[in-house]
Structures are given as C-alpha cells and as structure tokens.
Regions:
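Bacterial N-terminal signal peptides that target proteins for export
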Residues: 1-8
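Bacterial N-terminal signal peptides
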Residues: 9-18
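Bacterial Sec-dependent signal peptides at the C-terminal "C-region" and cleavage site
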Residues: 17-37
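Noncatalytic regulatory segments and standalone regulatory/sensor domains
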Residues: 33-49, 64-67, 83, 87, ...
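Conserved active-site-adjacent core of cysteine acyl-enzyme catalytic domains
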Residues: 35, 224-364
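Short beta-strands within extracellular/lumenal beta-sheet-rich domains
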Residues: 52-66
Length: 364
C-alpha cells in the first residue's frame, strides 16, 4: 500500500539510539499512544523561492493530529543530487500560541557541499529536540512543517518523495492486543551481519540493521543495488552532531533514497503489530534496551537496534542482533523471550524503522 495523506489506524500507526555499548538512558517509557501520518503530495504546500539564494521553502500550514501529542519524530525520503540538500523545521501551537520553529535536521546524500546533521542547543520553555525528536512540555494537536530545498551551485534542487510524521502522547495508555498467531512459526530470510565484523563497527547497530534489511529486499526484488554493505550505510547516515550513525530518520532516509523504496520512523502499540509485519513480509527494525532484551533486570542505558525476522511456534520473537561476537560463539540470529522483547522495546516507546517497496501491501 502506498500511503497517502491520512492517519493510519492505531494497528499500523507506526529518539535516536546508540548501539549496544552506547547511551540511551533518556529514552525510557511508560505506555504511550502513537499515531502516524505520511505525506507524499506537497502540491498544497505554500512554495516560496528566495531569488538571491535559490532556496525554496515549502510551508505546510497547520496540520492537526487526531489526538493531543507531546512527541514528534519527522522522517523523510528524497532524492538529493550532488550539491543539494534539505532542511526540516517544525513548530507547534500550544494554548493558541505558536512556538518557535525547531530544527529537526539537515540532510544530504553527499556532504561535500551540503550538511547532514541534527541541530543541537534548542531547549526553551516550550520544549527541546533530542537529536531527532521534538519533545514538548505540554501536549498539542497542531503542528506546522517547514521544509527548505537547498540548491546546488548549478541551481538544481532535491526532490521530496515522502515525509512521515510520527506523533506520540507519552501519558496515554494503549490496551494490549491479542497475538497474531498467523506469524508464529514464520521466519523471513533476512541476511545476517555483525557490526563487530567491521573496524569502527561497535557503534553501528543501526546501519548494520538497515544493511541487513536492504539486502533482504535486494534478494527478494532482484535488485542488487539495494545490497549495500555496512560501511556504506554507516558513511551515508553519519550525523556529525550525534556524533555517529544512530540518527533514526537519517537511517530510514538512506533506505528511502533508492527509487521505488520507502523508509520511515514510527511507533507501534503492541508486539502483535510486529507479527503482522512479519506475515506481510516486512522485517521491522526496532529500537530496544540491549540489557533488558538479553534478560537483565534493569536497563544500563545501552540502546540498541535489532531486526525482527520471525516468531517461533510458541510466539517467541526471532531477531537478527547485529551485536554478535563471533569469536565468543555469538550468533546474529537469536530467539529471545517474548516478555523480554516487549519490555526492551518499551524503552524506545516502541520505535520502529519500516523499510519496504513503496507499493508493498500491508494490512491496516
């Protein structure tokens, strides 16, 4: 299903994480309510061109969500030819007053002439940006998106394919869903890769997970150009202000830059939605607490990303965990207790990368 301008039902309403030895302690969670809106048609945006710089600004006007939210993650897919880039900004309406515009990132495939970085130092009385996540002090149901198309020296501009808006209310509660047992006993043939197989790979859980999923689609779609090795993904998602490769929208933007592919960040509500994705042939990448996933009682701030590739006959998740120390006998593909994954995933407020072909059908 190619997503158009609408809010998906909670069942598919879909923070930046460091890797297994990194720090993600600010991302702790209670139950929370998510919602997702995908924009693929920007013709209604107000378009303004700066005749001096050649920059083009797209202004969404005020967008109203179906519920009050206090966290927002913006992700995007675009073609950014050499020399071009994108800037994403958001403001919210709080008690009939507009906040300032918060910067949610500058993006470019090639960084020789344009920047690829998150924006630091934005905290004020209304909220803050935690690398890629706008966190408000008070909930709202309205936001405005401002996108700047940054031109190359020859005047060429990037082409925007998709913008995803992932809304979250941290204080809402979501009722658990019954398991989708159709997924039990099913496993997707996602290639296995360890981040520790590469120099500098200790912090590469995110690009390693993206590399595995892109390789899965390369084989399934017979598109070898999608099979990008881990260092290639890491170089293409590096955020100088993180600093590192854990910026969530940067990772999905890398996957979504390929023609016909789509990648975005979102939050889900329940493990049953991971089961639905597996049934539909889409391996989700999820952000988890490494410690809790592997059975420790408490989280030590070690954020991590893994690929959910299936479920056992008894409903335990099967994951491709990129933190595999082959010299110690570790395996990438592992079965983890269902309860461990549920608790570990809650530490990121059930954050997911979804990478799939644009026209791939998924259930709602």
């Amino acid at each position: 299903m190619r997503i158009r301008k609408h809010l998906l039902p909670l069942a598919l309403a879909m923070l930046v994480s460091s890797c297994a030895m990194g720090n993600d302690s600010s991302r702790r969670s209670k139950d929370s309510s998510p919602g997702f809106r995908a924009l693929t048609d920007f013709s209604a945006f107000l378009r303004t061109t700066n005749r001096t710089t050649g920059e083009v600004v797209l202004d969404s006007g005020w967008i109203r969500a179906s519920f009050a939210w206090d966290e927002l993650v913006v992700s995007w897919n675009a073609q950014t030819p050499i020399g071009t880039g994108l800037k994403f900004e958001v403001r919210a309406m709080i008690q009939k007053r507009a906040t300032k515009f918060y910067g949610l990132g500058l993006w470019a495939d090639d960084t020789a002439e344009q920047r690829r970085e998150s924006v630091v130092g934005q905290k004020d009385e209304d909220g803050d940006v935690l690398t890629d996540t706008l966190v408000l002090r008070q909930p709202t149901d309205q936001m405005q998106l401002r996108i700047t198309l940054l031109p190359a020296a020859n005047g060429s501009l990037p082409t925007l394919k998709l913008v995803g808006l992932s809304f979250l209310n941290r204080n809402a509660r979501v009722a658990p869903q019954p398991p989708l047992k159709e997924a039990w006993g099913k496993s997707l043939p996602v290639p296995e890769r360890s981040q520790l197989s590469y120099p500098g790979g200790r912090d590469w859980c995110s690009p390693t997970s993206v590399s595995m999923v892109l390789s899965y689609w390369a084989r399934r779609l017979n598109r070898p150009e999608l099979d990008v090795d881990v260092p290639g993904v890491a170089a293409g998602v590096f955020d100088v202000n993180w600093p590192g490769t854990g910026n969530w929208p940067f990772n999905t933007a890398f996957a979504g830059r390929f023609p016909g592919m789509q990648g975005f960040v979102t939050r889900l509500s329940d493990i049953a939605e991971l089961e639905a994705l597996v049934v539909d042939g889409v391996p989700p990448i999820i952000s988890v607490s490494y410690d809790v996933l592997h059975g420790r009682a408490t989280d030590q701030g070690n954020g991590h990303l893994v690929v959910v590739v299936g479920f056992t006959e008894n409903g335990d998740p099967i994951v491709n965990d990129p933190w595999a120390r082959f010299e110690k006998g570790d395996k990438v593909r592992q079965v983890v207790p269902r309860a461990n994954l549920v608790r570990a995933w809650a530490h990121s407020r059930r954050t997911v990368y979804l990478i799939r072909p644009e026209a791939w059908l998924v259930r709602q």
